[in-house]
Amino acid sequence: PQSNSKKNGVVKNGNGVNGHVLMDFSKIKTGGKFLTNVVGSEKVFCKELFSEEEKMIYEAMKDFATNELLPLSQNELNKKDEKLIRKLVEQMGELGFLGIDVPEKYGGSEMTKTGMCILAEGISFCGSPSFCTVWNVQTSIGSLGIIWYGNDEQKKKWLPGICSGEKIAAFGLTEPEAGSDATNSKTTGVLSDDGKHYIVNGQKIFISNGAWADTFIVALKIDGKFSSIVVEKGTPGFDIGKEEKKMGMEGSSTVPLYFTDCKVPVENLLGKVGDGAGPAFCGLNIGRFKLGASAIGGMMLGMQHAVEYAKSRKAFGQSISDFGSIQDKLATSAILTYTLDSTCYSVIGKQTEAINELDKDDPEYYVKQGNTTEQYIAENSIVKVYGSEAAEELIDHCFQIYGGYGFIEEYPMAQAYRDNRINKIWEGTNEINRMLCGRAMITKALSGEIGFKEYLEKVDVYCNNGLDSGYEGDLKTEVECVEAAKAVYAICLNESLSKHGQDIGTEQVIIENLANILIYAYVGDSTLSRVIQNKDLYVQKNQVVPELCAKVYTAEQGIRVMEYANKILN
């Protein structure tokens, strides 16, 4: 850590950080506190804490995915059969799987955010990422803008149909010249002379659910201000383009949208002119989380396929599952799955706690709910990045176990390999999500929101006297490894601020590697906290795999922290 003499560093004094007066954030529920809290010091939500109702929700969705969707995953669900898709979506509506964030008075089931995570994992046992996409869009970016920012009339008009599955939802953000820089939208809306319509002109690309959707939340500029509006299928001047021919996700709909003097009623505007960031980015924030969470079931399914194949495949007179190299791949797959599982439920547990403290009778309740999830943008980006990259690594291992058969379409790995690649691109590329994570944590550190000033003082002590987490137990070495990574992050951030000051936000390589350290720290923290919390249960059930997963992940990935630090400092 740098001394107070550093001009642009994090100056630690009684008045705050870098001259900012600090509020008392100690009792506020917000994201990012994992950095300054010791591993295991707070209770984390995990599968072992599922209520009976949550267990029922999990089994219901998993049963639907396994019994209704999985038999169709290698064939029918890859044909873009709109009639079949609508039938299955309506079935999900009847089961209450579409209105998870929607109040009952608008036709929804309004589950907790933990329920949302449970369903996101459960549906991914279907073996069809294409159909998972239909559900993900329907329940996040295609509807959350209306739930959180729509008025009562808008909610009454569109949400019941979305919840029942009668209407399919979509979201139009990306443009030919505005991808990750979404606020650079060239699509415009101009108020008509009679004041009754916005005349919309522009184009959107890569729109999931696009060919089938009935309602579209569309981002655009009105009077130069980023806004969001709902456009209905069939509106004059609104045309849906041809399906894109894609490398993977063959069963999902992906089309461009065209607006040519499209007359959209002014009452379709979500919020006010200039409020577009809320509907667009709050929905994306949850969509990112769900993308990561929905990888869990798919990873479990991939492992199941690989284990069954390895047991049945004979080579050199024995099952290949007996070979150490195959066992290593399966062990790595188990570690990836358990750590992602732990991370997802830890993240959503914190958000659920924060949302539960909101006043449901507050007229701004749903806007505040969206704003609350934004406080966890770093953690949600971590879930998206780690989930997509963990799934990619696991699929590669399982593909390799299949050998040449992995390359054959009638076996499950070829489709999984192709379909997963997009997950590192949509919902914001992994590079963009690392930027979001890194910048969000810097903001929280400088604001005093996560107690970073006080934490730096502890790091000073660590550097002089050695690290002592205060934890005593079988996992002491692993806990202190993760705590050391947090300290390394603090040192690297302080050094970077000293060198670059306010310009640090433009130093992408530095931000990316700071984010890499945070990803390791949060995944390690979540996994170790879960194992420590459930130690007695695991001993009782003679379950040794969770602790082994935590130990191996901490050791193997911890080595990389110094590589990231060297890139930052050098």
Locate predicted features.
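Glycine-rich beta->alpha junctions and the first turn(s) of the following alpha-helix
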Residues: 19-20, 46-50, 56-57, 239-341, ...
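C-terminal helix-coil-helix/basic helical segment that borders enzyme active sites and/or dimer interfaces
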Residues: 73-80, 338-386, 399-400, 501, ...
